[in-house]
Amino acid sequence: MASSLSPPEEASYHHRHTKRYTSSASSASSTTNGTVESSVSDFVKRPKISHPNYISSSEIESEFSHHDPDFARINNGSFGCCPSSILALQRDWQLRFLRQPDRFYFDELKPKISDSRSVIKRLINAEHDDEVSIVDNATTAAAIVLQQTAWAFREGRFDKGDAVVMLHYAYGSVKKSVEAYVTRSGGHVTEVQLPFPVISADEIIDRFRIGLESGKANGRRVRLALIDHVTSMPSVVIPIKELVKICRREGVDQVFVDAAHGIGCVDVDMKEIGADFYTSNLHKWFFAPPSVAFLYCRKSSNGGVADLHHPVVSNEYGNGLAVESSWVGTRDYSAQLVVPSILEFVNRFEGGIDGIKKRNHESVVEMGQMLVKSWGTQLGCPPEMCASMIMVGLPVCLGVSSESDVLKLRTFLREKFRIEIPIYFRPPGDGEIDPITGYVRISFQVYNKPEDYHRLRDAINGLVRDGFKCTSLSC
């Protein structure tokens, strides 16, 4: 599909977004010859590798050549991506286990997982290695924290009716976990209603203060605040540092930050954020194979971390959460073992992971503004409140009027136009006239190109010209 940029603009765009690290003998695909023997200190002590050049655009294409070339894949936020070189190293780890499982289990698994934890600890600026546990995903991490909350209610450490405060836009599975662990144990749940579209961070801060006051009503004590770092749908970067400070001033016992879209997408610094618990997937924006995440548990948290346990109980029960999480029975641990190699992969890009975040943010804003201009709509939040994802309003004339409509439209775009894109339904407010009720969430990752977004632009414009309505789509 022809680009809407002029040749000089196109050349400038690709120059800005493909300045990366070289593929030299130390690239991830050749590192360690499949044995992954380098010590963790080799990676964490050298945040930047001193190569004269950066990975080229053709090398990036090769790393992601397993992606279906017929699709505009602009939904990295849902499932992430993993480069071919890391997938090859993952396969090496899988074969090492299958080749001699006894030696792998007794001699290699725990120290290599410990290496991965050390990499994560330094990336997130945690104080101690044992504050970091590696788990399957952010959903598992939420279950660990909420399980502790449930036990506190059941054992009488929390009074029945004490509150857990969470954002209305919390991820669906986390809401279900709150229902399963907190509500069933006698806790009171307060949801903070957030606006969308969002005009400023102050709106969110003000609404959060109101939500906390509601949680504390009738003499209740707020035992846990559950705050997203980047909400999923709609996607907005939450001012978590400010919200954590408010929680401290208001006497909230513990703060848990759900950052499924954290590492590789936004700045993640445990000492600056100051939360008791923080979780982030590594397979969404840090190029890990699915699935792997970390759970940070601050040692000085109220109630300590000794009563945090993995929900899958193994013979490691009672040895600390980090050790419990390192063995939950026979399974494939390879996604956890390639973390040091992923750090080396991202350091092939100019600026490492920070450079990737910056370029992804700039690119997704640029593409979002291009779509807004073409469709005559608006962004869902100011550019500074998005990371590597941004919400873009769809033309009102498409007639998006329900959750069913957005699901059908998403399927239609995938099957007819080969575009992978999530869509959000925003119910109209009272008195609104012709509001935008449908928003697409576009992501930008290193493998994306402007033509991916041009395909979406042109598909929607074509539907508008044809008088398309969501009501025309069958179930």
From Swiss-Prot:
GO cellular component: chloroplast
Family matches, as SUPFAM superfamilies: PLP-dependent transferases
Modified residues (N6-(pyridoxal phosphate)lysine): K284
Compositional bias segments (type: Low complexity): 22-32
Gene3D superfamilies assigned: Type I PLP-dependent aspartate aminotransferase-like (Major domain)
Main location: plastid
Extent of the transit peptide: 1-24
UniProtKB keywords: Chloroplast, Lyase, Plastid, Pyridoxal phosphate, Transit peptide
Annotated segments matching region Disordered: 1-40
Location of this chain's protein in the cell: Plastid, Chloroplast
Protein function: May catalyze the production of hydrogen sulfide (H2S) from cysteine.
Membership in a protein family: Belongs to the class-V pyridoxal-phosphate-dependent aminotransferase family.
Protein name: Probable L-cysteine desulfhydrase, chloroplastic
